Every structure is written in C-alpha cells, then in structure tokens.
Amino acid sequence: MFMSTDEVRRAFLSFFESKGHQIVESSSLVPANDPTLLFTNAGMNQFKDCFLGLEKRAYTRATTAQRCVRAGGKHNDLENVGFTARHHTFFEMLGNFSFGDYFKEDAIQYAWEFLTDVLQLPKERLLVTVYETDDEAFDIWNKKVGIPADRIIRIGDKKGGKKFDSDNFWQMGDTGPCGPCTEIFYDHGDHIWGGPPGSPEEDGDRFIEIWNNVFMQFNRHADGTMEPLPKPSVDTGMGIERISAIMQGVHSNYEIDVFQTLIKAAADAIGYQDLTNQSLRVVADHIRSCAFLIVDGVMPSNEGRGYVLRRIIRRAVRHGNKLGAQGAFFHKLVGPLAEVMGTAGVELKKQQALVEKVLRIEEENFGRTLDRGMSILNDALDQLSGQVLDGETVFKLYDTYGFPADLTNDVARERGFSIDEAGFEQAMEEQRQRAREAGQFGTDYNSLIKSATNTEFCGYTASRGQSVVREMFVEGAEVSTLSAGDKAIIVLDNTPFYAESGGQCGDTGVLKTDAGIFHVEDTQKLGNAIAHHGVLAQGVLATGDQVDAIVDEKRRAAISLNHSATHLLHAALRKVLGEHVAQKGSLVRAETLRFDFSHLEAMTAAEIKEVERLVNQEVRRNHSIETNIMNIDEAKAKGAMALFGEKYDDQVRVLSMGDFSTELCGGIHASNTGDIGLFKIISEGGIAAGIRRIEAVTGEGALDYLDAQQAQHDAKVSEMAAKAKLLEKEIQQLKDKLAAKESAGLINQVKQIAGVNVLVAQLNGADNKALRGMVDDLKNQLSSGIIMLGNVAEGKVGLIAGVTNDLTNKVKAGELVNMVALQVGGKGGGRPDMAQAGGTDAHALPSALESVDAWIAERL
C-alpha cells in the first residue's frame, strides 16, 4: 500500500487521537526554556518538564509530528548528510507519549496495531529488540502480540561500557528518569547487505529501526541505585522519512516523495540533470532545515543558532556552485518545499516571502566571496605535500571568505584530504564563540533547583495576598532559613506575582513578615512553581512562614498598559502592512515596549503614522479588555491569533479588545484600552533580515517622551535663533565693511555744482541699513556736500539722500529723495540732513538719478 509522507503523518496522528491522545502541534525548533539544547532534536523535548514532574497538563496522552534539527553540538549529522541514505539535518519525529497514564503493554499494542493494521506492513518483515533484562516487554511481544521468540532480540550493555550503557536503555543524564526501550526494525530483504541488531553485521542497511518505545520507569540516583517511578511514562519516536520510504517501496530516504520533489526542484534551479548526484541530496536536505529554522525565528548570524543556520546555507550554496549554479538558486526551493510538506507546511506558506528573502540575501552575500575562497582552497590543496590542510589556512578561509570549517572539510574530503581541526581551533582563539555551541547554551542552572511545589497564581485579580513559604534556594541549594543580605529564590504556595512569560517581564515587590522583609527583584517560572528572586533586606525568613506578598502596583500598572498596547500594535501592523506580519518576539517593561515582527523592508513614515493613528483610535474607543477561557480549537475558530511555535495548553486564555484584536495571552493587562491614554512609536528598525523592531511608549511614558521631545525642540529652536542672531550680526558687519569699501570708491565720483560737492550714484544689492551707513561715511569724508544714492535689490528700488548741515538751508534731503522717488513709482521723505524712500520701477532709476544735478543746481 503506497502512502505519501503527508498521508503517513495524518494517519499516525489520527490513529493516536482515536486512542485518546491529544494532538499537540510541533513545538518550535528553538527549544523553549531549555538553555542546554541548541535545537529541538526529539519529540519529547517539549514534554521534558512533564516527564520530570515539573509541569502538569490538561492531558496525560499526547501525539505529535515534531520538526527536529540535528546540526551542531552533540547531535551533529551535518558532515554525513547527502552521503548516506538516512542522515538529515532536518527530520520529522512522529511520537506518542504517556505521562503516568498507560505503560508498556498499551504502548507496544498501539505500535503493532498501527504498523500492521493501519499501514498494513507484513508482520514477517518486522522484528523487535528489548533490553536484556526487560522480561516484561519480552513477554508482551511474545505472549500478547504473538511475535515468535526468535524474532525478539535481547540487547545488553555495550562491551567495556558502564552498566545500562545500551542502545536499548534510555537515560536523560547521569541521574534522573531512565528506563529500558524496545525498538521495532523493518527487514528490507536479503538483497541488501546487513544483519539484525546485535549481530556483527548490524551496521548494514537491511534491518532499519523504524520505531523506538522508551519506558521511563526508574529514577537513577547519584550512587547508581534505581528507584521505581511512582508514575512511569512512555516516550516513543518514529522518523517519518524512514517509515515513508517503506510505504513508498524505496530503500533510501532520499527516494521518498518529499525529497524527490526537492531534488528535482534543485536540479531545475541549478540547471543540472543527473538526479542521483549527492550534491542535490545535500541541497534538498538543507532547504528543509534552513526554511523551518527561519520560520521559527532563527536568522543567519555569526553566533549560536544563527551561525549553525549560516553554515547549513553556505554548505548548500557550495554544493550548488559545485554543480554549476549561476546566481542565487537556493531560495527558489522554498515554494516547492511548502507545497510538498502538506499539512506540516502551513506556516511556511504564510512566511514564504520572508524565508525566500532571507535565503536570497545570505546566498548573494556568500556568493561574492565563494569563488575567490574556492580558488584559494583548491590552490592550497594542490600545493599540499601531506594529507592534512593546516589550521591557519582553514581559519583564513573562515575569517576572510566566510567558509565554515566543516565546509572546508567537505571540500578537502572530496579530494582525499582532511583538515587540522586542532590548528584551526588554536587560530580561532577569542573568535571561537562563533562555533557550534555558543556560550549561551551552557549549564541549565535552573535544573539544579527541583521544586516540588505547584504555585497557584492569583495575580489576575489581586496585587497582594497571604502566602506560605514552601521552599527557599541559595546558589542552587535548598535552605530552610534566610538571614539579612542573603540572595535567594523563594517559592510560595500561591502568589500574586506574575512570572516572566510571553515577553512580559516578571513582577517586583516585597514579601513581608513581622520578622523580615524580602525584596523581590524578579519573578520567573520554575516548572509548575513560581520563583521569587531577590534579597532578604532585613530580619530572618524561614520555610513555613506566612508572608504578605505585595506586588509593586505602580510598576505593574505601567507594564499592563504596555502589554495591552502591544496587542493593539500587532493588530494595527497586520492591517497596515499585511497579514504576513507575525510576532517574532517582544519585551514588555514598565518603561517601554518592544515588538519584533516579520516584514521585508523598513516602514515608511506614512506607515508608522498610520499604525500610531490606528492604535490611538482604539485607545480612544475605550474598549473593555475581556478575557475568556476556552478550548484552543474554539479560540482559533474565533480568529484568536496564536504565536507560532508557542506552547499552549488545551484550555487557553483569550484576550479581546473590541473587534480590533483577539489573541491568546496569559499576561497582565489593563481593564480598558482607554487606560493606555496615549501610544507613541519612538523607533523602528531592522534587527535581522526580514525582522523589524518597534519600540514604543504609552501613558505617562508617552507624555514624558513628548515633553522631552518638546523640550529638545524648544532648545533647538532657541539654539537656532541664537545662531541666526549671531549670523545676522556677522552679516551686517560684513555688509558694513563692504559699504565702507564701496564708499571709498564712490568718493572719486564727486563732482562740483556751483562750488558744492555733489555725489549721485546707483548701487545694486545693498540694503537700506548699509546705504545709510555709506551716506554717513561719505558725509564725514566730504565735510560739506550733497549725496543721493539709489539701490536696486530683489527688483525693488531703495533711495537715500544726505546733506551736510551747512547746506540744509538750501537743499533739504527730504525734498531731494521725494523728487527722485516720484519718478520710480514711490515716495518718501525725512529730515533735512538725511532722508530715504522706496520705489517699484527699477528701470526708471537711472534717468531719475540723472535729473538730480539739475534739481540741485536750481537751488544753489
């Protein structure tokens, strides 16, 4: 029976749903609240706290089709990808899980029923393994299922290894939950080399593991003793690629429908026809991990997860280049991938444009140095006397041309060489943080604290309450008392303090008793407990004490305004920019809010203004902010926005603001949108390819921001006015100097009329103030005389006349200037010794000035 990969996925989930399992969406490839993991690499990752007893959900049975990535860190399949039949950077793990519900018998029966009844696999093709001492599992397979004893293989501990070091014994760590597992293998037939598990030929490809059932039934202590768990659990996993290969009658995973579609698409994009080439397999595999990592918010960078993504992209580009790709090709595979992934590709389709742009930009950037880097690498290999390429060359390729070391190793291996990894690491020195596991993926200090408390949160309706101290921790160790000055984590039986979640920061405040005061500086989740981080400011505190838990109300109120505004902002962005906008992160504090979202380009000033207008419009409408608890499917049916990759319980809290915004949210919010008062965007910018960030303020913070902006504006205006005044003064000084210089030249134009000094002249471009200064200067130089100056500036006529005091009884300056003004379309007057006028007819000025001599002569 042939089944497509999507049909296998749907059949698996439907089968276990019929067995009472909750279908849980695949979690993000970026593990939530687990700093020990680079990427989600197994179906059980999102249920880790459930298995540890730190988290309780509304269901005890679950089933998933989990997206996984193994590339970098401990689980690194990168160098084998494309060269074997079953290694991938990205894969899907089908799984069914029991959290203290059913155990071995049901798990085994379910697996067998699905394989033989639903998928109709031939029973004779299946064999199973159990841990050597797990008689219970052996008997279930043999007596309940009916598998002959010779097809049930007991697998013991590895030779030379520790006890329980076996392929059929699972353990989370040196201590903690662990237990035996049973694996189901499929026999591809004797035409393929290989032996059954446990045989010398087990590494062959004839018998392929398709399903692993892990039975968590013990808690291992540090001394090695095994204590039975009170509620044993089940964790199973079946790789969809392997089972799809069987259902499609092929042996290699790369022959299934998903990969064949991608291989053909890659061949078309590159212009290469041989579909069996291993480089096409590499490209087909890598587009899956790259695309879904970007969907889950990872962007190419030089550190942490972003650097792993960059390495995978560049490895794919190099293999495309090897096949003769001209120009960018990798991003062209996103569309075919979204289609062939079926029900698992819905979110990829929504973000297709973003994923394509990120890949294209990264590919183009690397393409600028790829050819040069390959030339240097090939030259170095050509000149190599031994078999190992030195670390300095590997580092140069990394540092200068962006070649990850594993890419260089790929090329070297293809030519029969290896690289000096130790030398490369030495050359890296301080830059080594860019490598596989960035420093942030280190010790999970919270794992040192195992809280048995399930804290009840009562902060939606109250900001203070009575609580009992259940547990206290100092530096990871549980203590029973605290003294003044101790920095500690306190767990209460119930609390009004909100623990950081969903981008909203944790509450602060105090825990008070008659004997002590504990300042809460932060609040975080600790499994099902809520951890109050802070310091005992005074007195003492002991486990069992009753405390007054008091939240800083003013700070919380400011946070709630910003959180509610974030929801309005999200909705407004989708209305203004489009439905492709998806939240990629947020930080809600008392002072500001920060919102990261998917968008391909910078927002225009008009778009920012429109988003602000929409948000403030909804603020003024003063919607009641309503919360309702409902089933998640019902919430989605009502149009509630859920954050992709976020983990939700079956019952969710739906927050609505009129008909403008409906989202799933567990945070603290205002009562009405009007409480926000005012919303103001203070910045918008890019933080990664296709990811934008808005920072904004609300309420008093917005008013403070606007006041500060106004103060800055006023200060700038005052500063500019002072500068303008200074410039005006400097300009006038320059004009005065220029006038003085011109007046010195005019003195040579003085003529005698009836024995009196007379100066008549036309200037251009001077202002009246300069003309007056010029006349005063000329009068001083002449001692006795009559001066008439005309000036044309910006098409208008300016006139000024000056008469020394000894001549004003004969010629008056006011009469003189008025006579000239009448000829140029104006009039004027003034004192006998100084007068000015204006006119509009600049063309008449020369003839008007020519009439001055005769007019003066008549009066002398």
Swiss-Prot record:
PANTHER family: ALANINE--TRNA LIGASE, CYTOPLASMIC (PTHR11777:SF9), ALANYL-TRNA SYNTHETASE (PTHR11777). It is found in: Cytoplasm. It comes from Vibrio cholerae serotype O1 (strain ATCC 39541 / Classical Ogawa 395 / O395). Consists of three domains; the N-terminal catalytic domain, the editing domain and the C-terminal C-Ala domain. The editing domain removes incorrectly charged amino acids, while the C-Ala domain, along with tRNA(Ala), serves as a bridge to cooperatively bring together the editing and aminoacylation centers thus stimulating deacylation of misacylated tRNAs. Zn(2+) binds at residues 563, 567, 665, 669. HAMAP family: Ala_tRNA_synth_B (MF_00036_B). The keyword Cytoplasm applies. PROSITE patterns: AA_TRNA_LIGASE_II_ALA. Binds 1 zinc ion per subunit. This is Alanine--tRNA ligase. The keyword RNA-binding applies. Belongs to the class-II aminoacyl-tRNA synthetase family. The gene is alaS. NCBIfam families: alaS. It is an enzyme of class 6 (ligase). Pfam families: DHHA1, tRNA-synt_2c, tRNA_SAD. The lineage of its organism: Bacteria, Pseudomonadati, Pseudomonadota, Gammaproteobacteria, Vibrionales. It comes from the Bacteria. Its EC number is 6.1.1.7. Its main location: cytoplasm. GO terms for cellular component: cytosol. SUPFAM superfamilies: Class II aaRS and biotin synthetases, Putative anticodon-binding domain of alanyl-tRNA synthetase (AlaRS), ThrRS/AlaRS common domain, Translation proteins. CDD domains: AlaRS_core. One of its GO terms (molecular function) is zinc ion binding. Its cofactor is Zn(2+). One of its GO terms (biological process) is alanyl-tRNA aminoacylation.
